[in-house]
């Protein structure tokens, strides 16, 4: 599985990463190094709000023209906001790359944020918030991060708060984008059958009016982690439970070991230890999963399950039993080999999703200015020892390090 990439930095500071392939479908877009954690206290929800408004009008296009520009050639225009980045991108037949790069440059750098569009979009996002709050199996993930990062932007809901959203004006969105939507604070990525020299030429042309303007913003680091246990009473037909702690940041060498342990415990395979214990053997849950998120300076490890109210304690005991097994005894040679083989296969299969691969490339290059070759990832996994996994287990899964959030 070969991975090739080309990298170039424009005079205005915009970095370009290009991953060529022979597919008829290409992906390209801008990734901005700004997300929910970069909002001021009075801007909660602004990163996501701006992402919505990028499609609502520029100096030369109305919203309808933006929506139809790629649709007319069968393409797709999309965006998402995360805690640490915002990505605006398009999927299209490779021959339409010039159209895509011109449109994306226009909406990312020249959006005007008309007030009448803001007033309409506020109601759309509030409806999104209400829909989200009706889904406890999703909402609990945000509430758990708030438990892990109290009084810190990483603990905030990406969607924001209705009372603040109603206060947002055009100048607020313009102020936010002028602070973060700068060429040196983002990257342009493209994956597909598009010539690299052509990519550089067209991106440079579309961003020729931009200049580098290095800011002084520094992200606030989280305070020292103190485990918390919280039970909230909600009117739901089943209980929802989160167990976990802060994890390793994306630079930490131990992250690969935790990644493998996370997969052993509650990865997507039906043979994960938690799925076998709680669902297959006990019939206590429909869904149980373990998740790992790495930020630039911290991370989150968590286990989620939903069960009948009367079965919460039993499920908790089974989860802690599986965690204790990993702490008490290193994996055998056979267990370690099987775990490595499974996760390497899963990564290989996941790379068959071109859109996911393009977005993953963008996120990695944005934050770390490099791109991992899959073979390098596989080598790091293969190099892991049982002793390393055992040490990480005892560091991460010790009961006195775990936080718990329960919806009853």
Residue ranges and their predicted role:
Residues 48, 52, 152, 240:
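Histidine-centered active-site/metal-ligand motif
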Residues 2, 9, 66-215, 221, ...:
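Charge-rich, well-structured scaffold segments of protease-associated domains
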Residues 3, 11, 225-227, 273:
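Short beta-strand-initiation
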């Amino acid at each position: 599985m070969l991975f090739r990439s080309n990298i170039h930095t424009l005079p205005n500071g915009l970095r370009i990463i290009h991953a060529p392939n022979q597919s008829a479908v290409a992906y390209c877009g801008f990734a901005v190094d700004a997300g929910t954690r970069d909002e001021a206290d009075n801007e909660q929800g602004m990163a996501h709000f701006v992402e919505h408004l990028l499609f609502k009008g520029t100096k030369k296009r109305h919203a309808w023209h933006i929506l139809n520009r790629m649709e007319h050639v069968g393409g797709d225009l999309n965006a998402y906001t995360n805690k640490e980045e915002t990505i605006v991108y398009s999927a299209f037949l490779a021959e339409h790359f010039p159209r895509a790069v011109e449109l994306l440059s226009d909406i990312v750098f020249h959006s005007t944020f008309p007030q009448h569009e803001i007033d309409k979009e506020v109601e759309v996002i509030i409806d999104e918030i209400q829909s989200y709050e009706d889904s406890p199996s999703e909402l609990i993930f945000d509430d758990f991060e708030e438990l892990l990062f109290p009084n810190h932007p990483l603990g905030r809901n990406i969607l924001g708060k209705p009372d603040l959203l109603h206060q947002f004006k055009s100048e607020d969105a313009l102020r936010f984008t002028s602070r973060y939507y700068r060429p040196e604070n983002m990257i342009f990525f493209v994956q597909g059958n598009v010539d690299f020299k052509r990519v550089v030429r067209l991106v440079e042309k579309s961003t020729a009016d931009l200049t580098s303007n290095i800011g002084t913003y520094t992200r606030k680091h989280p305070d020292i982690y103190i485990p918390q246990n919280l039970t909230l009473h909600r009117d739901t037909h089943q209980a929802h439970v989160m167990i976990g702690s802060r994890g390793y940041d994306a630079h930490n060498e131990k992250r690969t070991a935790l990644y493998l342990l996370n997969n052993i415990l509650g990865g997507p395979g039906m043979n994960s230890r938690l799925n076998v214990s709680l669902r297959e053997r006990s019939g206590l849950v429909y869904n149980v999963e373990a998740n790992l998120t790495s930020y630039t300076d911290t991370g989150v490890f968590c286990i989620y399950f939903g069960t009948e109210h009367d079965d919460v304690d039993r499920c908790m005991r089974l989860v802690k039993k599986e965690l204790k097994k990993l702490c008490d005894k290193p994996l055998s040679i056979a267990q370690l080999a099987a775990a490595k083989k499974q996760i390497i296969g899963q990564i290989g299969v996941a790379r068959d999703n071109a859109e996911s691969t393009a977005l993953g490339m963008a996120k990695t290059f944005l934050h770390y200015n490099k791109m991992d070759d899959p073979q390098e990832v596989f080598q790091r996994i293969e190099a892991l020892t049982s002793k390393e996994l055992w040490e990480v287990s005892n560091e991460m899964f010790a009961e006195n390090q775990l936080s718990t959030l329960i919806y009853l």
